[in-house]
Structure formats: structure tokens, C-alpha cells
């Protein structure tokens, strides 16, 4: 019996000794480890009570922290005067070991003298860094990270292989040339648009520099990436065949010459304009609702001597109303070849149509009774019948040789048409036969 009591006593002594060590560590004053302006900011946010004394136990409870590098500090006891100060170092931030969410906001040109090793934040779930110069980012130790946003930071390299819990990634406005996401199968949203070198244009007048993007293989998963934004880059290829759960894609303003979407049957919204694509087949995308695919080889970015209306073939999905909302609602086909222009009556559920600059002489919209927004500017249309378009409220007819337009059956509130001087120029060039355009507007228009 005495032996048992002795063993229990020794165990209790061991626990007590360990607690003493922890308490000793928690009571350590680390104020001198912090940058003075960072301490001032923490004091102003009431995270610490005294800038001369910061105990680990004082900040261990902090799980959510948002810091701005610019702060206003009161100069007198009456709080009547404040001055602006800049945090130039994040020294000391590493002592916030319990952080689950961290947001850092700078002023675009901010270059901080000391940036913590983010891998030390083992509990971190969300990390957001905005406008802070950060060419490299090591988050390999943040195994629980689910949301990462690093925008306008001049980031030129990032390794996400160990961040397999990542669900949302936003690296907008950085300098990434390659991005490998093959290990990140939990991703749902990927935003990597506008990777560029400031002030420099690449071949073709484009600014984007991201030339390689590897997406995870989600074919065997019940979920996967549903939103992909990679516009304004330098991509010549984009493989989305292993991403069957994609619902929204914006890959506009790249250098794509082809885009295969037959494996993306959940696709609802696609913007692939301003690439170099000659053929597009969306027959397998029966749930498509919003499509923007014009400007292929757009005049401003075309290669010298090439036709800038590169899209010669366009196959749209067959329209089946009430199939999970799967009918085309918005279509933008600016500057495409005449042979690629679809028959609009085949898409009766359209609400928005942009067919500008397509050399059209006539346009039949009699079947499009749901149409609300129409842009048919810069065409050769001299007559336009809108009697069936009773829901139309926005119309753009700039640079069209119309003489009379009856809008009395529509709900038009916004009309864009030529000024007198522009029509005068059109008459001189023989493009328009008369100076005036007569508009018959609906009752109550003002």
C-alpha cells in the first residue's frame, strides 16, 4: 500500500513540475522581441494592455488577427490628435502560435523588413495577404490551411504540395509563371488571374506571364474544383479534362488555340474570349447558361497579317428548358466569322445577347421573347424588328445605319446610339444614308 502511495505521489510531482515549466514559459516577457510599431498596433487594437510587457499567456488566446501596415495613433490623452504611422516589420508576430485566421493588408509597395515564417502557424486555417511585397511564401508547415489569398504581392513562386486541405486559392496580381496544383484535390475555387510583370507587355500586346497551370485530377472524387479564374495570362494550353465538377471558368485573354469542354458537363458559365481559338464545340455542355467566346484573335492582339476573326466554327448546346436550369441565358459573340454566327431563334431563352461587330445586315430576334439586353452595335443592320421583344430594357445600336426604330412594344430604359457628328461622318463615308435616326419609344420612357 505504501508503494502505491509513493508512485502516485511521484506522478503528481511530475505533473506539477511540467505545469511549472509551462507557466514559466507563459509568463516570459517577450515585449523586446516585437517591432515597436507592431506593438503600438496591437495596443491600439486592445490585444495587449502594455507595450512594455507582453506575456505569451496574454496572446495565446488570439485565434483571429487582422493587421494593416498603416495605422493612426492617438498622440494625447484627449485623443484629439492622431498621426499616421507605418508598420515596417512584423517581428514578433511569430509568437501568436494559436492563430487560426491571419489577414495582413499593406499599401502595394510595402517592403517589410521582417516577415515571419508562416509555417510556424500550425493551427492556421485562413491566410490572407494583400499588397505586401512577398516574392516567396513558405506555408509548408500549415497543414490545416483551407483558405489562402495572396493578392498583389509580387509573388513569383509558391509550393502547395503539402497543403492538401486547401479549398480556396486566390493569387491574383502576382508574378507566377508556373503553378502546380496536382496535389490539392480538396480545392473548390482557384483564382490565378493577371500574373504579370509590371509595365511590360509580352508578344501580342499581352501582359500575362503565367504559362503553365496544372490542375488536380478530380475524376474519381464526388467533388472538385468548381470555379476557375485564370484570365489575363500567357496560357497556350489549359487541360480541364480531369476537372469534371467545373461550373464556372474564365480563361479569357490568354493564348489558347483550343479548348476542350466535353468532359465538363456541369459547366454553367464560360468566358474564353480574346484567345486564338478557331473552333468551339459545346454540344456536351447542356447546362451552359452564360457564354462569352468572341474576340478570338481580337484586332488589337492579332498577329500581323492574320485574320482577327479566328472563330470559324461554333457549336452551341441543344436547348432543353427546365433541365436543371440548363438553357443559354447570356451569349456574347463579338467579332466572330460570319459562318460561326448561330441562328438566334434556336436559343429562345436568351436574356442577354452581344453580337457586336459581326458585319450583320439582318438579325431575326422574333423568337427571343425573354431578351432583356441587346448589343448589336457596329453591324450593317439597316432594319431591326423588336416587336416581339417585350422584355427588352437595354439596347446598343451604336454605328448601325438605322433610320427608323420602333421600340414601342419594348420596356427600353437605356439606349446607346450615335451622336449627330458620328452620323454626319457616316453619311460622308456612305455608310449611313441619312443624318437622323427616328426612335419610337415606349410610353412612359424618360
Language model: regions and residue ranges:
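Consensus "Asn ladder" position of solenoid repeat domains
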Residues: 107, 132, 153, 174, ...
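Acidic/polar low-complexity surface segments
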Residues: 194-208, 217-220, 224, 295-306, ...
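Asparagine/serine/threonine-enriched low-complexity, disordered tracts
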Residues: 142, 163, 174, 184, ...
